[in-house]
């Protein structure tokens, strides 16, 4: 079944620093996703703690927050058929050793932390994350 969805994707600081925004956006658009909203921002620790709240207390939480707040990110809302699943497929596996060539992470990630991109993991997460990153956007 086909569902028109919106999802949040983020080019993380390592991807922005390496000039990968255009290549990543092209990969999403080539699969039929449309850019609905986008911004370059250096996220606050407060925003990131809300975004990653399900990981609070895990050993990687603090390093993840520090990394994600270390520089600008390119946050975007993408729209399309089965957008959540499609973005995750294009991104590739979270763990760099599991990411296949041809995926964003398979081609560009240097570690599981420095894995270039974020994509919402469910429709519910997408709604919550978009509300955090784009509070001005009415969906």
Swiss-Prot record:
EC number: 2.7.4.6
Descriptive protein name: Nucleoside diphosphate kinase
A single cellular component GO annotation: cytoplasm
Single GO BP term: GTP biosynthetic process
Required cofactor(s): Mg(2+)
Summary of subunit composition and partner proteins: Homotetramer.
Keywords: ATP-binding, Cytoplasm, Kinase, Magnesium, Metal-binding, Nucleotide metabolism, Nucleotide-binding, Phosphoprotein, Transferase
InterPro entries: NDK-like_dom, NDK-like_dom_sf, Nucleoside_diP_kinase, Nucleoside_diP_kinase_AS
Organism expressing this protein natively: Caldanaerobacter subterraneus subsp. tengcongensis (strain DSM 15242 / JCM 11007 / NBRC 100824 / MB4) (Thermoanaerobacter tengcongensis)
Location in or out of the cell: Cytoplasm
Nucleus in keyword set: no
GO molecular function: ATP binding; metal ion binding; nucleoside diphosphate kinase activity
Catalytic machinery residues: 118 (pros-phosphohistidine intermediate)
CDD domains found in the cross-reference section: NDPk_I
Family: Belongs to the NDK family.
